[in-house]
Amino acid sequence: MRSATIQRDTKETRIGGTLKLEGRGRYEIATGIRFLDHMLELFAKHGGFDLKFQADGDLDVDQHHTVEDAGIVLGQLFAKALGDRKGINRAGYFVLPMDETLAVVAVDLGGRPALVYKDRVKVRLVGDLQTELVHDFFDGFVVHAGANLHAKVLYGRSNHHKLEAIFKCFARAMKYACSKDARLKDQLPSTKGLL
C-alpha cells in the first residue's frame, strides 16, 4: 500500500499529514480555514485518497503561510507516497461540469514542476478563504510533488463553483496519474529512464 506521513514545522506553521493513495476517500481535515478544509475534503473524496491533514498556522497574521504550506505538505505527501514512480500512469486530466461552471485540470507527475492556473475568480474571499492564495497552494504543491499542473475554469458564474470544480478535477486527474498501469509493472513511464 502506497502511503506517506509528513510533519513540517516552521516558525509560521505546523502541518502534519498522512496520505494513502489506494484509499476509500476518507478524510480528517483541520487547517483553521474552513473553505480550504472543504476543498481538501472533496479532493480526498473524489480522488479516492485517505487523507489526514492538520495545520496550525499564524492566521492572526494572514492566511498566506498556512495555505501555501498546506500545498507544500500535500506535495511532499504525494512525492513520498509515489516513491520511485515505477508503473504509474504519470499523467492524467479531467474535465468537470459543476452546474454552470466548466473546469479542466491536467497533471504530469514527471518531476518537472510547473504551474499554469486560471480560475476566473473575481472576488477576494470565497467563504473564509482568500482566493488569491489558491495559486500559492498549487505552486507549493507542484514544486514539492514534482508535478506539472494546468488548471483552468473555462466559464462559470459562481466563484464557489469555480474553485470546487478545480479541486474536483485536480482530484480525478491525480487519481488517474497516480494509478498503476499493470502493463508497465516496474518500468518508469519515461523514455529517459528516470523521472
Swiss-Prot record:
One GO cellular component, as annotated: cytoplasm
Main location as per UniProt: cytoplasm
Pfam families membership: IGPD
GO BP terms, alphabetized: L-histidine biosynthetic process
Pathway assigned to this chain's UniProt record: Amino-acid biosynthesis; L-histidine biosynthesis; L-histidine from 5-phospho-alpha-D-ribose 1-diphosphate: step 6/9
Lyase as UniProt keyword: yes
Source superkingdom: Bacteria
GO molecular function (one): imidazoleglycerol-phosphate dehydratase activity
UniProt-listed Enzyme Commission number(s): 4.2.1.19
Localization per Swiss-Prot or TrEMBL: Cytoplasm
Family matches, as InterPro entries: IGPD_sf, ImidazoleglycerolP_deHydtase, ImidazoleglycerP_deHydtase_CS, Ribosomal_Su5_D2-typ_SF
Keywords: Amino-acid biosynthesis, Cytoplasm, Histidine biosynthesis, Lyase
Catalytic function, reaction form: D-erythro-1-(imidazol-4-yl)glycerol 3-phosphate = 3-(imidazol-4-yl)-2-oxopropyl phosphate + H2O
Class of enzymatic activity (EC top level): lyase
Family: Belongs to the imidazoleglycerol-phosphate dehydratase family.
HAMAP family: HisB (MF_00076)
Protein name: Imidazoleglycerol-phosphate dehydratase
